[in-house]
Amino acid sequence: MKYLDTTTPQSQYSREFRNYYNWYYFSLRKKYLNLIDKNFYKKINLDILVSSISEKNIASSYVFHNICIYYSIKKFLNKRKINTIIVENEFLKKNIRYFYNGIIQIKNNEKIGKINIFRIILEHVLIFGVSKLISKKKEIKSRVNLVDIFITNNNFKIDRYYKNFFLNKKSFYHIPTFVNLNLRKIVSCLLYFNKKNYILKTQFLTLKDLFYSINFIFRVDKIKIKKTFFQKLDIRDLILRELYLRKNLNASIIGLQNYLFAKNLKNKNIELESVLNWNENSIVDKGWNYGFRSFYKNVKTFGYQGFFVEKKLSSIDITNNEFDAKTCPEYIMIVGSILKKARSEFVKKIKFISSRAFRFEHLFLKKFHTKKINNKIIILLNLDKETCIEIIDKIKRTQFVQNGNIVYIKEHPLLKLSRFYHKPLPKNFKIINGNLYDVIKKFKVVITSGSSSSVYESLLSGSKIIFPINDYYDNLNLQMLDVPKSYYKVCNNINEIDTYISKFLNQNTKHFEYYKDKLKNSINDKRNTKFFGKN
């Protein structure tokens, strides 16, 4: 082998190198999360707290990716002779040089997106200005409850997080954060919010607060990082480079604004009964929870987690010092008792509350759909563009597709396929629209990756799941939910994908219905579960 290029997308790695990478990506997760917890949560620095480093999300971590690359190269060189290795940064070149004498080239694919930074700044300035002009100031006279909510480019009148549970409840106010909305849509939202129980953060944020949050772009270069060792590897330079790249910048700015919002509410003597956060333990959430737990020490803070297990989205996992630093809610609200084990992997002191499963309650009313399609499959896409591209490309190579069988693609509601997939699709690939459950209930076979709510809706509808990429996490996620292995298959190659497409399509529907009742036992039934004291 003449050269090894580690700067390409993972889907373009050789099979052998990809297998090493996936193994380290899986096996080093706990050590990495504990390292971040130990080095960045014992004493809180606000700018570090809202940086991508502290988010400790391996799915998007530049640091963790390069650690895995380092160990994969080391392992690979034990088996193969390589003339040239191409890496992304000086850190890898310097550390690989200790055990490799060949040519090492640096190809910096990761650069600061100056246009993206300008776009983010402009969006925040516009949202701040338009909100100040259009939004009515709401007078808060008594103790109230605040509800953290995100407004996406779906119908903003339908709350996809709490299913309008808090709408028009006098003592509850929604605190919205806009996600991927254009200015026209934001104006429409603001006019609607004026008539409903919504409070804009901008009502309590000043121009100084806006500039402070945006100035994070410049302050991040002044953050001091001491030597930080992962095993015997000093990763300080990797951490500094991730900070330099301003990863997840928009979330960092929102996290700071959430913190300042809590601070300003306290300074204006606003009395609170409770605070509810839609909690994925992201840096947006950390700013929110650290703010309210710092300035409202006696107010109960709740984090609602209306989803299942996704160990690759490792920000969800609360770690020990993080818990003690109060950057997470005091109470975690889960939609099924089976989730306690997964959520308390790193710290056992978490206070759990069994809560309503708003996203899944409609499934209790659904009947098993016996008329399933025997000769077509469906791909469910998520928000990971690279993974989606790899899934589509793999399915295109199957014999099932080569034989002309129809493959449907269900796009993620927040990400259209045309925005990232620029290759031609075969004529037998078709985009399908409609309500997710009403679509997937007709299919025996669902192709996907990750552990989004769509996976569990698929299982509840009686579908079998095929994961065409083996990164070990899909298997771990479903094991933690006690999903029988007969209901899914993690495949290692194209032949396995074809084998299990054929196997599942040819199974009698009696093999599909069993798991619906089993998984429903893992989801809280609203008839037996209260949410904030109400059904």
Describe each region flagged by the PLM.
Residues M1-N535:
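Catalytic-core helical/loop segments in enzymes performing group transfer/polymerization on anionic/lipid-linked
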